[in-house]
Every structure is written in C-alpha cells, then in structure tokens.
Curated annotation (Swiss-Prot):
Lineage, top ranks: Bacteria, Pseudomonadati, Pseudomonadota, Gammaproteobacteria, Enterobacterales
Assembly and interaction partners: Homodimer.
Pathway annotation from the record: Isoprenoid biosynthesis; dimethylallyl diphosphate biosynthesis; dimethylallyl diphosphate from isopentenyl diphosphate: step 1/1
UniProt organism field: Escherichia coli O1:K1 / APEC
Binding site for Mg(2+): E87
UniProt gene name: idi
UniProt-recorded name of the protein: Isopentenyl-diphosphate Delta-isomerase
C-alpha cells in the first residue's frame, strides 16, 4: 500500500492541507479527518479486532472492526471499503452512516494523541476474513449486546473511540439494527 496521508482540518472542520499519516500522530497531533467502521456478518455478529502491536497509537488494544483516514479525493465511504479490503480482506455492503458528527481527542499510554473528526459507519460482509497481520493481531465475531455490556463494565479494555461511539444512544440504536438478519 502506498504512503497514506491525513487530511488536516481547522477548528471548523475545513481541510487545510495534508500530512503523512505516521508523522501526523504525535503528542501534538493536529486535528484531522478519519473514519471508524463497525462490521457485521450474516449472523448479525460484530467483528471486534485487536490492533497489531506495531501500530503507533493504541497497539494491542481491542477496538471496533476497522478505522482509517480518507485520502484526498476519496469519500469516507470509499475509504471504509478500501480499508476493509486492506486490513480484513473482505468486500462489504455500502457503508451506512451511524454517527456522522463524531469528533474526539484522546491520548494513549505512550503519549500519542488521536485528534479526529471521525464519522462512524456500519456495514455487512459475507466474505471470509483474510486478516492483514500488520494491522490486526486478533479478532472475534461477537454478539453486539455482549460487546456493549463489556464496554459498559470495562471501558478501559477497549479503544477510547470505540467506547465513545458505543455510549452514544443514537449510535447504539443504529448499530443494533445491523444485528437483525437480512
């Protein structure tokens, strides 16, 4: 995969430039555009992934299915599809927006900051996973209700963005719709 960049944003969310992704994530990370996606299988189960230990921010942490950064000229939905192929080796249904105005700032134990405008999506797949070990070290298909109970009981065991997304009432409602079999 070619070098990725983040799209830098001003306080109003207007693009101001780009920066190489690895260089962008520091103790003083500038506000930038990202996305987060929750992926469900044909049984209505959620894919929870554990970030590879080589990840700069939150290595080894359990999180939602896939996250990333749209590239210049790429829609958020196109970016979700691209990252699902790259990280998980799967084709997905068109991503659906479940929390369009999510924005957060969090600092990991190593001092790396995430500072993102991060629309949240959900999608389905019927493909078999082909995990990219550079991105994901472990994964589990889980019942959404069990994951939400785990987040409520032990939020420290999950990425902060996953916790913040999952504790939003409207996002929970929209995620629950993906557990219904089609």
């Amino acid at each position: 995969m070619q070098t990725e960049h983040v799209i830098l944003l001003n306080a109003q969310g207007v693009p101001t430039g780009t920066l190489e992704k690895y260089a962008a994530h520091t103790a003083d990370t500038l506000l930038h555009l990202a996305f987060s996606s929750w992926l469900f299988n044909a049984k209505g189960q959620l894919l929870v992934t554990r970030r590879a230990l080589s990840k700069k921010a939150w290595p080894g942490v359990w999180t939602n299915s896939v996250c990333g950064h749209p590239q210049l000229g790429e829609s958020n939905e196109e970016a979700v599809i691209r990252r699902c192929r790259y990280e998980l080796g799967v084709e997905i249904t068109p991503p659906e927006s479940i929390y369009p105005d999510f924005r957060y700032r969090a600092t990991d134990p190593n001092g790396i900051v995430e500072n993102e405008v991060c629309p949240v999506f959900a999608a389905r797949t019927t493909s078999a996973l082909q995990i990219n070990d550079d991105e994901v070290m472990d994964y589990q298909w889980c019942d959404l209700a069990a994951v939400l109970r785990g987040i409520d009981a032990t939020p420290w065991a999950f990425s902060p963005w996953m916790v913040m997304q999952a504790t939003n009432r409207e996002a929970r409602k929209r995620l629950s719709a993906f557990t219904q079999l089609k």
